[in-house]
């Protein structure tokens, strides 16, 4: 890799891959860079809020199912707008899916990481760079309030549930007045 592509690769590794590896317990908090430790705080908060709202389960047995389900959910998530909150939801969703694969011992977590990496590179990175890159993402993560986190989690869940046709999930969200 050279020049600009190397910079992009480093941004994705810093923001996405590092958190996924941390979430899967492949690296410890002490192995995260100072930047990753800062964004980990907001991503952990997103994950906790998401976890309180619904348990996301997957039915994934092969690489093609992962690519299809992952791409469907995140395409729906970003079809009308990209923003830092949705990017946080994307990263947390990616980490959860990778951890599910690791815990299921089906050795497909690398497929999730590669699919998430490629999606971010081709679909999100241009927007991220034009909106301040890592510095602006860090600023967002340091200054987000609970209302923006909850709003983005509700939006993410509505897109996830619509794509995955999880009627019970949608009903749960409606019962909790979340969608």
UniProtKB/Swiss-Prot annotation:
One of its GO terms (cellular component) is host cell mitochondrion. It comes from the Viruses. Gene3D superfamilies: Blc2-like (1.10.437.10). It is found in: Host mitochondrion; Host endoplasmic reticulum. The keyword Acyltransferase does not apply. Its main location: host cell. A motif (BH2) lies at residues 126-141. Pfam families: Bcl-2 (PF00452). This is Apoptosis regulator Bcl-2 homolog. The lineage of its organism: Viruses, Varidnaviria, Bamfordvirae, Nucleocytoviricota, Pokkesviricetes.
């Amino acid at each position: 890799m050279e020049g600009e592509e190397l910079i992009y690769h480093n941004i994705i590794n810093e923001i996405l891959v590092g958190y996924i590896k941390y979430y899967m317990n492949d690296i410890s908090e002490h192995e995260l860079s100072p930047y990753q430790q800062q964004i980990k705080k907001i991503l952990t908060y997103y994950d906790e809020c998401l976890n309180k709202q619904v348990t996301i389960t997957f039915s994934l047995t092969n690489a093609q199912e992962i690519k299809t389900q992952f791409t469907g959910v995140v395409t729906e998530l970003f079809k009308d707008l990209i923003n830092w909150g949705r990017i946080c939801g994307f990263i947390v969703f990616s980490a959860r899916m990778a951890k599910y694969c690791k815990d299921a011992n089906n050795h497909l977590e690398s497929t999730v990481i590669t699919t998430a990496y490629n999606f971010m590179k081709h679909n999100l990175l241009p927007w991220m760079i034009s909106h301040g890159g890592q510095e602006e993402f860090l600023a967002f993560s340091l200054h987000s309030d609970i209302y923006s986190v909850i709003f983005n989690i509700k939006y993410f869940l509505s897109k996830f549930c619509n794509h995955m046709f999880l009627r019970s999930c949608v009903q749960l969200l409606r019962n909790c007045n979340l969608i």
